[in-house]
Structure formats: structure tokens, C-alpha cells
From Swiss-Prot:
Catalytic reaction equation(s): 3-methyl-2-oxobutanoate + (6R)-5,10-methylene-5,6,7,8-tetrahydrofolate + H2O = 2-dehydropantoate + (6S)-5,6,7,8-tetrahydrofolate
Protein name: 3-methyl-2-oxobutanoate hydroxymethyltransferase
EC number: 2.1.2.11
Gene Ontology terms: biological process: pantothenate biosynthetic process
CDD domains: KPHMT-like
Gene from which the chain derives: panB
Residues annotated for Mg(2+) binding in this entry: D51, D90, E120
Binding site residues for 3-methyl-2-oxobutanoate: D51, S52, D90, K118
Assembly description: Homodecamer; pentamer of dimers.
Length: 272
């Protein structure tokens, strides 16, 4: 199979065009330049420097210990390996506690190569989203299971089950878009609900454990490669390196599966 090539770098307008055209968007995490180059050359549209690095790189039990300094360091590394993909970066725990604090952290990340900032949650985070967007910073709103809220949630659990919870999540998604979010990431949400949200909103949705009805998919690279992170393997994960081959081949297989709709399958999704 030939190496994927994209003639144009991904931009915010390109995301909107993909939504209009029904083109699936492929996203993966990376934490260093070497893997970023592989993703960039093999069909990945958006590269996410996630605070998941706290668990899969640093070995913590959650993402809470990750600092802005950590995110700046890894973003700078990944940015050196990306040419075509858009670089999306998490604001770590409490870096978005206030609009001013979020702007300071986001600015530091943009200066080393970030092109979009991802923020977890709704509520007061809507003010943060608006504040950043008003200052020309594209924002991805992460809803559903938000790992930075693991202590409040009591663990990593499916969100939005039941009519009341589902309605609340749909309202949060609409509010995030109204606040200016360019992209929504839906994590561990029943597939039917994620599909409804995807229809509700004008911006693309990226799912992880949210079914095939989203506009795109994301996985943690270590999960896609079957690497042991020391944590239970989520239901939504598929090991694309299980039958051998190369890292590049596994990334291509994932990208192709997202685009042709074969991933995620029913076994990787949750129901209401």
C-alpha cells in the first residue's frame, strides 16, 4: 500500500469542509517527533498531543499530574515532526481554571506549534472557550467522559446514558459550539447519542468510544499499537498491530478503517 499523501495542510476551514462533504476525519495522539512523522505520512489528519501522556508516557494513574510545562515540551517535539496534519493540544488539569490562565497556557502552546487547543468539560469552561476564540485561538471542546474529572466521576465511566443525562450532554454540545468551539471530541458516549449530537451541531465531532456516527475518530497511539500502559484496556480500543507488520502499516490500517467506516465496529461502542 502506498504512503498516504495530502497535498494541503489541514486547517480550520478544511475541517468545516470535511463535515459538509461527509469525509471522515482521522485523529491520533503523538508525544514525540518520530511518531509524529509516521502519523503525518500515513493518513492522519489531526495529531493530538494529549495529556494522556501522563499515563502512557510518564506512568501516572491519571492525567492530573501533567503540567503546562510538560505539554509545552511534548508539543514542541511533535511539531517538529508534523507537516500536513493539524496539531491539537490539551490544556492540562486546572490550566483552564480561569480565562486568563487558559490564555497564558494556550499562548505558550501556540508559540511552540499548537494550532488548536482542547479543553475538557462544559459549565464555566464555556466562558474560557469564548475568551480564547475571541482572541483568535481555535478550540476543541472535549465532552462526555472527561479524564480530568475522574475524581468527581468516580472512575472512567460511560457518560450520557438515560434520557436526562443524554439531553444534558446534547445541550452542552450545542452550548460549546455557540461559545465558539471549532471541533467537538466525544468520549465514552452511547453511539446513538453521539450520532444525535453530530447531527445537532454544525462543527465536526471526533469520537473515542462514541460510535461510528461521529465525523471522525481518535485513539491513543499506544492503544492502537497494543502497548501495555499498565491500565485496563478500554472497550473502544482495537490493536491494529496485533497481526504483525510495522507501526506505519498499523497507522495506515487505522486511517483506512476510519475512512471506510469499518472502525469502530459494534464491539467498540457503547449503547444507551
Amino acid at each position: 500500500m502506498s504512503i498516504y499523501t495530502n497535498s494541503k495542510p489541514w486547517t480550520v476551514p478544511a475541517l468545516a469542509e470535511a463535515k459538509r462533504n461527509g469525509s471522515k476525519i482521522v485523529m491520533l495522539t503523538a508525544y514525540d517527533a518520530g511518531f509524529a512523522r509516521i502519523l503525518d505520512a500515513n493518513g492522519v489528519d489531526l495529531v493530538l498531543v494529549g495529556d494522556s501522556l501522563g499515563m502512557v508516557v510518564q506512568g501516572h494513574d491519571s492525567t492530573l499530574p501533567v503540567s503546562v510545562h510538560d505539554m509545552v515540551y511534548h508539543t514542541a517535539c511533535v511539531a517538529r515532526g508534523v507537516r500536513q496534519a493539524m496539531l491539537v493540544v490539551d490544556l492540562p488539569f486546572q490550566a483552564d481554571a480561569s480565562p486568563e490562565r487558559a490564555l497564558e497556557a494556550a499562548t505558550a502552546l501556540l508559540r511552540v506549534g499548537a494550532q488548536m487547543i482542547k479543553i475538557e468539560g462544559a459549565g464555566h469552561k464555556l466562558e474560557v472557550i469564548s475568551y480564547l476564540v475571541e482572541r483568535e485561538i481555535p478550540v476543541c471542546s472535549h465532552l462526555g467522559l472527561t479524564p480530568q474529572s475522574v475524581l468527581r466521576l468516580g472512575g472512567y465511566k460511560v457518560q450520557g446514558r438515560g434520557e436526562e443525562a443524554g439531553g444534558r450532554l446534547r445541550a452542552e454540545a450545542r452550548a460549546a459550539v455557540e461559545a465558539g468551539a471549532t471541533l467537538l471530541l466525544l468520549e465514552c458516549v452511547p453511539s446513538q447519542l453521539a450520532a444525535q449530537i453530530t447531527t445537532d451541531v454544525s462543527v465536526p465531532t471526533i469520537g473515542i468510544g462514541a460510535g461510528a456516527g461521529c465525523d471522525g475518530q481518535v485513539l491513543v497511539l499506544h492503544d492502537l499499537l497494543g502497548l501495555d500502559s499498565g491500565h485496563p484496556r478500554p472497550k473502544f480500543v482495537k490493536d491494529f498491530l496485533a497481526h504483525g507488520g510495522s507501526v506505519a502499516g498499523a497507522v495506515r490500517a487505522y486511517a483506512n478503517a476510519v475512512r471506510d467506516g469499518s472502525f469502530p465496529d459494534v464491539e467498540h461502542t457503547y449503547t444507551s
